[in-house]
A protein has these predicted regions:
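Sec/Tat signal peptide C-region and signal peptidase I cleavage site
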Residues: 20-26
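Cleavable N-terminal signal peptides
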Residues: 12-14, 24
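Bacterial N-terminal signal peptides that target proteins for export
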Residues: 2-12
Length: 341
């Protein structure tokens, strides 16, 4: 059986940082983060882990530039273009325009972008996208089965597709529970039909994460899914103070039980997307002379997205609910349970 890109274990001027593994190499992988920083315990960090894994596996050089604001995107990308990068990886939907402009101006430079797909595709850009609604559907069903108040909540960082896809899947998972059980669990914070909901309009203010979770808790939610990168750490702090009997958090992107160890006990689970694995695969393809524009898509079936283990809360999740989640996972994979419209 061949190498599976998703069977590996791991957001967004300017300070240039370099990391080397082993001896200096002729191959250099470069990355531009979105706001939030390289060590955000979530989006940027997970993508950077893919570079770190490639350093360990292949002995390449890795560099990154951190974007402190959206105004840094163009300058950061252009700086790396001048830095002899064999592949430039940009992290996040918001870097889509800047990446496209740079790619068109530098057609011989390979690029890859996390969470963006170009239509029509660009010949020198490989997009990395994820069917996170599939895993979030499982999280919504789980939350509906675990809530005591019959109210769950979610909020996003910015109203963009890579954020709302989590919220869509979560809401549909709750709807599926209600339909199967004749129940009436309510989702606060997102209306999939109206495309309206709660958004902090940033990915880095932990105080907003606390405040938004507090508002949802005050309205009765006892499980909250923050889809806002490091902002969600503020929600976890609130859950830590209130106690998990009153508020549980569902993480996103990485398994926050491992990346947010100080508050790991508040996470019921996490909706993970394996950016580390796709970044690693892009680097390997490029090293092997196999780079071409197009898309890599992470799904439940190939392990590109998933629902993390319940860890410390495993004993709280009924065996019947676990069995139902396994059956739903199989149904999503074989197409008998529809998630996307």
């Amino acid at each position: 059986m061949g190498y599976s890109p998703f069977n590996r274990t791991v957001f967004g001027a300017v300070a240039l940082c370099c990391a080397l593994a082993g001896q200096a190499s002729a191959f250099t992988a470069c990355q531009v983060t979105d706001t939030g920083g390289i060590d955000d315990n979530s989006f940027n960090q997970t993508a950077w882990k893919g570079v770190e894994d490639a350093q360990k596996d292949f002995g390449i050089e890795g560099r990154f530039l951190e974007s402190q604001a959206e105004t840094d995107y163009d300058a950061n990308i252009n700086s790396l273009i001048e830095g002899d990068c064999d592949i430039i990886i940009t992290v996040g939907f918001l870097l889509g325009d800047a990446t496209e402009k740079a790619a068109k101006a530098n057609p011989d430079q390979p690029f890859s972008i996390v969470d963006f797909a170009y239509d029509p595709p660009l010949s020198n850009v490989l997009g990395q996208v994820y069917a996170t609604d599939q895993a979030a559907f499982l999280a919504g069903y789980l939350a509906a089965g675990m809530t005591q108040s019959k109210i769950v909540g979610t909020f996003g960082g910015i109203n963009i597709p890579p954020v709302t896809i989590f919220m869509d899947g979560f809401a549909k998972g709750v709807d599926h529970w209600n339909a199967e059980k004749g129940d009436s669990v309510v989702v606060l914070g997102w209306d999939p039909a109206a495309r309206e909901g709660l958004f902090t309009n940033n990915f880095d203010n932990l105080d907003d994460g606390r405040a938004f979770a507090q508002n949802l808790y005050d309205e009765g939610a006892d499980i909250v899914l923050p889809v806002a990168g490091p902002v969600g750490l503020g929600s976890a702090t609130l859950a830590d103070e209130l106690g998990i009997d009153k508020l549980k958090i569902i993480g996103v992107d990485a398994d926050l039980y491992f990346t947010d160890t100080e508050r790991q006990h508040v996470y019921l689970t996490s909706v993970t997307k394996r950016m580390d694995a796709t970044v690693h695969q892009v680097i390997e393809r490029t090293m092997n002379g196999e780079f071409e524009g197009g898309l890599l898509v992470g799904t439940l079936e190939n392990g590109g997205v998933d629902l993390a283990p319940f860890h410390d809360m495993d004993a709280l999740v009924p065996d019947e609910l676990k069995a139902e989640l396994s059956a739903i996972r199989a149904g999503i994979i074989d197409g008998s349970i529809a998630v996307s419209n």
